From Swiss-Prot:
The chain crosses the membrane at residues 9-32. It comes from Oryctolagus cuniculus. The gene is ANPEP. The active site is at E385. Residues 33-966 are extracellular. Binds 1 zinc ion per subunit. This is Aminopeptidase N. Disulfide bonds join C760-C767, C797-C833. The keyword Lyase does not apply. Substrate binds at G348, A349, M350, E351, N352. Its main location: membrane. Its EC number is 3.4.11.2. Keywords: Aminopeptidase, Angiogenesis, Cell membrane, Developmental protein, Differentiation, Disulfide bond, Glycoprotein, Hydrolase, Membrane, Metal-binding, Metalloprotease, Phosphoprotein, Protease, Signal-anchor, Sulfation, Transmembrane, Transmembrane helix, Zinc. GO terms for biological process: angiogenesis; cell differentiation; peptide catabolic process; proteolysis.
């Protein structure tokens, strides 16, 4: 599943200093505003009410000896196949509810004798047949015991069938059910999405099963290791199209009502429940055939398809599929690849096997109004989801504790697949900014977590949802990139192909991948490792955090320590490796590559590679940032690197120019170098025109903005940034012929946005005039937008910030009338840039009205308001006052709470704010925090670190900005 961003996912080019930095995470991890009713849906006369004695007490009071009180399924029964018939009703019933009805037959094998059948079921009402919710029969002569009773256990989401006798080990059985569920607009399970076609409201029935919502669609053994085959048969209105994982086998009229069509799909391969998908809609498609005869189709609203918005996704899908087939040395496993853009969708995208679902913004692209970043998002998200068709779908992790392997791998190779489709963009470099740098801010906390956790620590749906975080996606991608780098890509691919061939249609744990990579290493002699793949990688997978590698060039000593943002924080999570890593250290001396060195799990060692003599000689470590660690140096080497940057920066690779800035600011935050040293590393930017160093600087300085934009430091800081960015602003003004054309390269187009956003937000009058004039031209002629799509996010935001009610109302009207989601998203984020308190308060109220802001966008909009220094207090008051309602409406397992807590607390840096946050935690212990539990602990830790950092650095920072802004 695409993070959507997490999100996002994630370009980091939308003007961090404008106060919308929260969007970088949100795009990746955009989340659902749930309104699923806590009570059960109204029941038809034939439906049994939910068991009035269904378990609902806290898990701690339950008898854990009873298997239906445990969240994990017993291993007594293994599913073989399902036959599922579903009929969604796309207009409300007499109670005003949208519903679906269904029937299911599951065939399963008894592995161990048992007198109980436990199968997942969530918010389904069952037809009583022969006195029970299920009918059980034997297969091939086996005789089932009689049913004693059935019950629904709400807390653990089970349908439990108690038997009068034992099921026999080795025998097969079939169980039939008939049921009804609500086709709710909660973005989970089998749900309803809506859109307008002219003045007509259209309804789509669609699915989102990951991680634990297939059970909301039909009763199933809803764990990833419980693979089976599926026969899916939707019954749908005649004029609608049904889609599923496979191609249709037949489509016939429903005998009793020809206005309905029965579409039966071919049997799926053996697969996990979370990868199922079925959709009923009036969407249309465009189609192509890949060189390997795979049918490729892009589906969306008819108007989007007719206007060509699916063409770019269609163009890149074939090349990306071919790239991965070659990369994995494994053919694409299915006959077709459908991809569909949905108006309402929780995540960025979902890798359902053969039927990938997307937010419209992650699939559709209009060259007339979409920006280059929108285009990059499409190609990278498509690559991410298609990578999963092999790694995750064909071979699946055994349990969610190894989710990092699925999502980290896809988050790494998405850059490779996208780079193949767009070879001139240099997309592979962006993984450093988008993934590695961003996740280190989280992984440097004592409340971080390892990539892989013991399986018994991940049980509930909320615990599973909590794993869909930046550690899983971005750290996973970063350490796999490091592994591929020190193995070489060829060896990595060889081991990967062996892994996929061995475990096709099966489940694995991460150790299985290590074993096959080790076999590839053992088959050759050119690459020699200091230890086994497992011994090296377990230190990166099983312990949280990462090292700071310190190179002392005066004596050649190289050492490592667990990097913590707050070095005084208490690390309570033990490590079998004592927080020491086996670290691959690449380096250069004065621009010349040195041989690779391994820091072999020891705290320090000495080597002449790292000793430097002479006033002008320097060492640079972690070339192209292939290693997942930060680098510190002795003061003399830092000064020499700064001199090199200010005299001839091109000697240092552009990625490492970004690394020097990023690492120094992080080291300063952890009090390992003076904050003035980190600030000195930005002095060369006055002559820098490359995107990556500028983006690293703006991302790092955004922390200073968050800490100081309410204090006297902010004025000198703005003056310094204005001075540094002015040459960049003039550079892009010149090469774009006074902003009338766009730069040639992707990186330059991104840095043009940085130039304008930074210039405007730091008071350069020419920039403010530019954006105000462009916005006024649009207001004067709303049907003719003169603002280039690349520049719209930053122009909209700055014009609204500089303007008042008139500008805001105009943008709101344009948002309400926007027909393309990319344009709507730009306007939605920009509306949070207002400097008027009452306008922001009004906008905040709109987020709870789904007629104004779609539920999928509510949380990200709240976060955008919180990222505005004026809106942050409004949102924090709102969250404190409404936490219980938000928790009930959004759902305890939603991804939204982690993002919401991070966004609203990111400026906290005073004792008063810490006390407020601690009181908030105490006040809501009974309600709970769901998937935001870890984020709350991280927010408390981050706030304490912020308080300490501000106290220790404020005076020095004020003095530095004052001295360097002249």
């Amino acid at each position: 599943m695409a993070k959507g961003f997490y999100i996002s996912k994630s370009l980091g080019i939308l003007g961090i200093l404008l106060g919308v930095a929260a969007l970088c995470t949100i795009v990746a991890l955009s989340v659902v505003y749930r309104q699923e009713k806590n009570k059960n849906t109204s029941q038809s006369p034939s439906m049994a009410p939910l068991n009035p004695t269904a378990t609902s007490s806290p898990a701690t009071t339950l008898d854990q000896n009873l298997p239906w009180n445990r969240y994990r399924l017993p291993k007594t029964l293994i599913p073989d196949s399902y036959n599922v018939v579903l009929r969604p009703y796309l207009s409300p019933n007499s109670q005003g509810l949208y519903i679906f009805t269904g029937s299911s037959t599951v065939r399963f094998t008894c592995q161990e004798a048992t007198n109980v059948i436990i199968i997942h079921s969530k918010k389904l009402n069952y037809t009583i047949t022969q006195g029970h919710r299920v009918v059980l029969r034997g297969v091939r002569g086996s005789q089932p015991p009689a049913i004693a009773s059935t019950e629904l256990v709400e807390l653990t989401e089970y349908l439990v069938v108690h038997l009068q006798g034992q099921l026999v080990a080795g025998s097969q059985y079939e169980m039939d059910t008939q049921f009804q569920g609500e086709l709710a607009d909660d973005l989970a399970g089998f749900y309803r999405s809506e859109y307008m076609e002219g003045n007509v409201r259209k309804v789509v029935a669609t699915t989102q099963m990951q991680a634990a919502d297939a059970r909301k669609s039909f009763p199933c053994f809803d764990e990833p290791a419980m693979k089976a085959t599926f026969n899916i048969t939707p019954i749908h209105p005649r004029d609608y199209t049904a889609l599923s994982n496979m191609l249709p086998r037949s489509s016939t009229a429903l005998p009793e009502d020809p206005n309905w069509t029965v579409t039966e799909f071919h049997t799926t391969p053996k697969m996990s429940t979370y990868l199922l998908a079925y959709i009923v809609s009036e969407f249309t498609n465009i189609e192509a055939q890949s060189p390997n005869n795979v049918q490729i189709r892009i589906w969306a609203r008819p108007s989007a398809i007719s206007e060509g918005h699916g063409q770019y996704a269609l163009n890149v899908t074939g090349p990306i599929l071919n790239f991965f087939a070659n990369h994995y040395n494994t053919p694409y496993p299915l006959e077709k690849s459908d991809q569909i853009g949905l108006p309402d969708f929780n995540a960025g995208a979902m890798e359902n096997w053969g039927l990938v679902t997307y937010r419209e913004s992650a699939l559709l692209f209009d060259p007339l109004v979409s920006s280059i970043s929108n285009k990059e998002r499409v190609v990278t998200v498509v690559a991410h989801e298609l990578a999963h068709q092999w790694f995750g779908n064909l071979v699946t992790v055994d349990w969610w504790n190894d989710l990092w392997l699925n999502e980290g791998f896809a988050s790494y190779v998405e850059y490779l697949g996208a780079d193949y489709a767009e070879p001139t963009w240099n997309l592979k470099d962006l993984i450093v900014l988008n993934e590695l740098h961003s996740v280190m801010a989280v992984d440097a906390l004592a409340s971080s977590h390892p990539l892989s956790s013991p399986a018994d620590e991940v049980n509930t749906p909320a615990q599973i949802s909590e794993l869909f975080d930046s550690i899983t996606y971005s750290k996973g991608a970063s350490v796999l990139r490091m592994l591929s780098s020190f193995l070489t890509e060829d060896l990595f691919k060889e081991g990967l192909a062996s892994y996929l061939h061995t475990f096709a249609y099966q489940n694995t744990i991460y150790l299985d991948l290590w074993e096959h990579l080790q076999q590839a290493v053992n088959s050759q002699s050119a690459i020699q490792l200091p230890a086994s793949v497992r011994d090296i990688m377990d230190r990166w997978i099983l312990q949280m955090g990462f090292p700071v590698v310190t190179v002392n060039t005066t004596n050649g000593i190289i050492s490592q320590h667990h990097f913590l943002l707050d070095p005084t924080s208490n690390v309570t999570r033990p490590s079998d490796f004592n927080y020491l890593w086996i670290v691959p250290v690449s380096s250069m001396r004065n621009g010349v590559l040195e041989q690779e060195f391994w820091l072999e799990g020891v705290e320090q060692t000495q080597n002449s590679l790292f000793r430097v003599e002479g006033d002008n000689n320097w060492i640079l470590a972690n070339l192209n940032v292939t290693g997942y660690y930060q680098v510190n140096y002795d003061e003399g080497n830092w000064k020499k690197l700064q001199t090199q940057l200010q005299t001839n920066p091109s000697v240092i690779p552009v990625i490492n120019r970004a690394q020097i800035i990023h690492d120094a600011f992080n080291l300063a935050s952890a009090q390992k170098v003076p904050v003035t040293l980190a600030l000195d590393n930005t002095l060369f930017l006055i002559r820098e025109t490359e995107y990556m160093p500028w983006q690293a600087a703006l991302s790092s300085l955004n922390y200073f903005k968050l800490m100081f934009d309410r204090s006297e430091v902010y004025g000198p800081m703005k003056n310094y940034l204005s001075k540094q960015v002015r040459p960049l602003f003039e550079h892009f003004k010149n090469i774009t012929n006074d902003w009338t054309r766009r730069p040639d390269t992707l990186m330059d187009q991104y840095n043009e946005i940085n130039a304008i956003s930074t210039a405007c937000s730091n008071g350069i009058q020419e920039c403010e005039t530019l954006v105000s004039d462009l916005f006024k031209q649009w207001m004067d002629d709303p049907s003719n937008n003169p603002i280039h799509p690349n520049l719209r996010t930053t122009v909209y935001c700055n014009a609204i910030a500089l303007g008042g009610e008139r500008e805001w109302d105009f943008a709101w009207e344009q948002f309400r009338n926007a027909t393309l989601v990319n344009e709507a998203d730009k306007l939605r984020s920009a509306l949070a840039c207002s400097n008027e308190v009452w306008i922001l308060n009004r906008y905040l109220s709109y987020t709870l009205n789904p007629d104004y802001i779609r539920r999928q966008d509510a949380t990200s909009t709240i976060n955008s308001i919180a990222s505005n220094v004026i809106g942050q207090t409004l949102v924090w008051d709102f969250v404190q006052s409404n936490w219980k309602k938000l928790f009930e409406d959004f759902g305890g397992g939603s991804f939204s709470f982690a993002n919401l807590i991070r966004a609203v607390t990111r400026r906290f840096s005073t004792e008063y704010e810490l006390q407020q946050l601690e009181q908030f935690r105490l006040n809501n212990l009974d309600t709970g925090f769901g998937s935001g539990t870890r984020a709350l602990e991280q927010a408390l830790e981050q706030t304490r670190a912020n308080i300490k950092w501000v106290q220790e650095n404020k005076e020095a920072v004020l003095a530095w900005f004052t001295a360097n802004s002249a």
